[in-house]
Amino acid sequence: MNKSTNNLQDLFLNNARINRISVTIFLTNGYKLEGLVKGFDNFTIILDNNGKQMMIYKHAVSTIIPKSPILFTNKEK
């Protein structure tokens, strides 16, 4: 896999961000967060819930569940 190839994590989060798909994020301590993905990098996710922004460290994330399906398309062959 070369550097220009996106990984599934980036494809998933970017698709949720671009299409404004609401997500539920479960943290490793069991806490549940809901909102829209506003941005992300290698270590964090910015989540917006009714104007309240949260920065979540990815190492604290257990599961991310979208409210509607995330479609994966691979433009590379």
UniProtKB/Swiss-Prot annotation:
Kindly indicate whether the keyword Hydrolase belongs to this entry.
no
Its GO CC terms are: cytosol
InterPro entries (alphabetical): Hfq, LSM_dom_sf, Sm
Q: Keywords on this record?
A: RNA-binding, Stress response
Stored PROSITE patterns: SM
Reading the lineage from the top rank, the first entry is: Bacteria
Which biological process, per GO, is one annotated for this protein?
A: regulation of RNA stability
Q: Where is the Sm domain?
A: 10-70
Q: Subunit structure, per the record?
A: Homohexamer.
Per the similarity annotation, which family is this? Belongs to the Hfq family.
**What's the protein name?**
RNA-binding protein Hfq
